[in-house]
A protein has these predicted regions:
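Conserved alpha-helical scaffold flanking the Walker A/P-loop in AAA+ ATPase domains
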Residues: 77-88
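Substrate-engagement module of ASCE P-loop NTPases
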Residues: 111-136
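Conserved P-loop
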Residues: 1-76
């Protein structure tokens, strides 16, 4: 199935992309027009008005809600995403709230987990979009995460 072209960039199966959260969200919804998806997001899924049937939504929150994943439980985040990648031949993953994962664990732990996911995704036809807010990270963290993943920015972003 065709992969959407977003901001002049062609997404490729088996790759992980780093995008600002707003761009990641809009790109994810374009993908889910033709693919199944999983989204780990900061917004409570029950408040989303335009939910898609093809998407499983998980809430990155310490809430006891059945659809919540605690930001300190990086193993559960990894497990949900790697299980999705194994179970779906063509799919898309959206992971938002990197700063919440870092606060719940550590930057080193999050980077290690994202690197493992990148390796797993590279063997599939999955596309993974990581939404992040560059302003919420220390410069050294931002430099490290931006060196690990292909970055997609809008022309007006720095």
């Amino acid at each position: 199935k065709p992969i959407p072209k977003e901001h002049g960039t062609h997404f490729k199966d088996g790759n992980v992309y780093l995008l600002t959260e707003k761009v990641a969200n809009s790109s994810f919804y374009k993908f889910t027009e033709s693919r199944q998806g999983i989204a780990i997001i900061r917004e409570n899924p029950s408040t989303i008005s335009n939910k898609k049937q093809s998407v499983s939504y998980l809430w990155l929150s310490p809430s006891n809600d059945e659809h919540a994943i605690n930001p300190s439980d990086i193993e559960e985040v990894y497990g949900k995403l790697s299980s999705f990648a194994s179970a779906h031949k063509n799919g898309v993953i959206l992971l938002e709230g990197i700063s919440h994962l870092i606060s719940g664990t550590s930057f080193t732990t999050v980077m290690h987990t994202l690197s493992l996911l990148k390796d797993a995704i590279s063997k599939t036809n999955i596309v993974m979009l990581i939404g992040y807010n560059p302003g919420s990270m220390e410069k050294s963290q931002r430099t490290k995460i931006e060196s690990e993943f292909e970055i997609i920015k809008r022309g007006d972003e720095t």
